[in-house]
Amino acid sequence: MVDKDEEQIKQNVEEDLSSTVEQTGEENIEFPSAPNHPKQVLVTDEELKALKKEATEYKDKYLRLLADSENARKRLQKERQEISRYALENMVVDFLKPLDNLENALKFAQGMSDEVKNWAFGFQMILTQFKDVLASNGITALESQGTFFDPHLHEAIEMVETDSYAPGIIVEENVRGYKMGDRMIRPARVKVAKAISAIDPQDKSELNENN
């Protein structure tokens, strides 16, 4: 009997629901919508403080990584520049010896006949062009004669007793020195004046060490 009553109630509810849908239309049935406001999450002061600390630590790590990356980039760039500079420096030093030979030959030709001088004039122009190319790459010759001896720029090969020059003045340049920018790539080999006195074989070494 109970089963029949339940069946009857279920049938009545379905009929009532069908009747309601037919009267109002399915599209007019309203269903409750979800709330449009975000769900609030409660955070304690301690948790908030911990989150801020963690965020600060991540920021510091990021900044350190960024700084390390920039430093590494600059270091690699500097190393590449150093490698290029030293490669150029070594090439120039090897090139200077034949350049010296050409320059010395042209000096010797100045005391020869006019025919030889005319022949040497063309090579003098070539020598000038070589020096212009070196200068365009920051490589310049050092003028030493008549200047004071400097152990950072000069190599003393002989001490010359003379009263024509003050002691320490370079009286003759045997091999010209060259600089690449501010860097000395080959010191000049020079003869240096000293006062007329008893011969002291230590003068040359002392001049190189003390100046």
From Swiss-Prot:
Region described as Disordered: spans on this chain: 1-38
Pfam families found in the cross-reference section: GrpE
UniProt subcellular location: Cytoplasm
A molecular-function term among this protein's GO annotations: unfolded protein binding
PROSITE patterns: GRPE
Cited InterPro entries: GrpE, GrpE_coiled_coil, GrpE_head
One example of a Gene Ontology biological process annotation: protein folding
Biased composition (Basic and acidic residues): 1-13
Alphabetical UniProt keywords: Chaperone, Cytoplasm, Stress response
GO cellular component: cytoplasm
Keyword Oxidoreductase in record: no
Function: Participates actively in the response to hyperosmotic and heat shock by preventing the aggregation of stress-denatured proteins, in association with DnaK and GrpE. It is the nucleotide exchange factor for DnaK and may function as a thermosensor. Unfolded proteins bind initially to DnaJ; upon interaction with the DnaJ-bound protein, DnaK hydrolyzes its bound ATP, resulting in the formation of a stable complex. GrpE releases ADP from DnaK; ATP binding to DnaK triggers the release of the substrate protein, thus completing the reaction cycle.
Family: Belongs to the GrpE family.
Oligomeric and partner information: Homodimer.
NCBIfam families, sorted: PRK14140.1
Protein's name in the database: Protein GrpE
Organism, as annotated: Protochlamydia amoebophila (strain UWE25)
